[in-house]
Each structure stands twice: as structure tokens, then as C-alpha cells.
């Protein structure tokens, strides 16, 4: 029944809305969930495109929440505020350059060679350990950048290079950029907010590229597939509206250690599942 497929889209949208912003890997969670819950009669080309384009719902939540801050044409902004807005966008562009120069050419290669349980599990664990170790270090080190307006262009570029590491499935785009920011002396609040903004060009760009590749390979969406995708995007948007606000408040009082522990636990479970699956497949 198509109604069941709609329910699956709702589930995928909820997972995307939560895991896109928490540094726990949306791709890793979608790979895991789709091992047990998957659409009927949908080919690999559609699912590859779906898992990326669903992110548009999540990123639109950032645009909605921060529209005033991101809009340089807001009538009541002073010239100084307009200048600050353009400077913010300039930093986002600078931070996006590594993804354009390195990420786009290597995307297919990473997709082909690392989009599997073992790779996802390993990256979940590695970054989980990284979060714990970095936060232990940061207990004795004060951040040097505590205001987004003061974020240096050099630091923005540094964070952008870390974003490229999220090409490894299981890394988490937000996880990679947050780790990069924390290592470079950026406060949790600043790097979290900058991560939200950095996702705008990257996720729109990634979605556009996936759709273009999908079409160029001779594929097309039927009404059912379009419905499944739109439902997932709408749900991801709604859930992201809450999760973004939650994480923004959370990092003001807490560190990322709990996410590190969660990543290690999930990565271990994925490895155990992979081992048992391999054993029983023989």
C-alpha cells in the first residue's frame, strides 16, 4: 500500500531532521535504518538521489530561522548591519571553496568506495573519540573566537577543509566542521551557528548535482517518487526547526561529549551487526 510508503518517508524525514544537525551522521543513520525499512520497488538511482535531496528540507529550516540575519536587503538594517551580513556571506563562501574544489571531483569516488557499513561505523567511532578528547582538552583552554562576527576568514577556510572530510560516510558534515572549529579555538556556539550557515551553499549544491546526475543518466521521477521525496523533505523541515533551536541552546551550557559517546556506541553496534550479517550470510 502506498500509505505505508508515505509512513516510511515520514520516518526518513524525522531521521534526517534530527541527524543532519546533531553531529552524529545523517548518512550513517539513513544507511542503518534503510537496512530494515526501505521503499518497495525503488531503484538504487532514486535512493542515492533521495538520500541527498532530502537534505533540502533540513537546510530550508536554517534559511527560515535565520532569514533576517542572513538577508542583507532587510529594509530596517543599518549600513553597518548590512556590511556585517555581507561579511558573513563572504566567510561562508570562503569556507565552501574546499568543498567545491575537492569535494565535487571526489564525490563519486567516495560514494563508490566508502558507502558501506564498515566505513560508516569506523568514522562514527573515530569522530566520537575525537569529540571526547577535544572536549577534555577544551576544559583547560578558553576559546579565542566567541563571536561569529569576529570569526577570521582563515578560520572559516580551516573549518571548510574539515567539511571536506565529511565525504567519508559516517563522518557527519556538522561533526566535521564542529571538530575543525573546536580545534582552532572557536567556541561551541559560534562553530555550531557557522555550521548551520555553511550548510546552505553546500547542501543546495550537493542536491542540485545529484538531481542533475540523476537526470543525465536517463532517470525521471514519477508522481509516486516525487510524493515520497516531498513528504520526507517537509517532515525534515519541521523536525529541523526544533532540532536547530535545541542544539543552539544546548551548546550554550553543555559540550559535545554526549554525542561522542553516542557515536562510539552506534559505531560499535554497526560493526557487530555487520559481523553477524556476514556470518549468517555464509
Curated annotation (Swiss-Prot):
The record's listing under InterPro entries reads:
UppP
Molecular function in Gene Ontology:
undecaprenyl-diphosphatase activity
Please state the span of the N-terminal signal peptide per the UniProt entry.
Answer: none
The keyword rRNA processing belongs to this UniProt entry's keyword annotation:
no
Q: EC no.?
A: 3.6.1.27
Q: Name its cellular compartments.
A: Cell membrane
A single Gene Ontology CC annotation of this entry is: plasma membrane
Q: Catalytic activity, per the record? A: di-trans,octa-cis-undecaprenyl diphosphate + H2O = di-trans,octa-cis-undecaprenyl phosphate + phosphate + H(+)
TM region positions: 45-65, 86-106, 114-134, 151-171, 196-216, 224-244, 256-276
GO BP: cell wall organization; peptidoglycan biosynthetic process; regulation of cell shape; response to antibiotic
What family does this chain come from, according to its entry? Belongs to the UppP family.
What is its biological role?
A: Catalyzes the dephosphorylation of undecaprenyl diphosphate (UPP). Confers resistance to bacitracin.
What is the protein named?
A: Undecaprenyl-diphosphatase
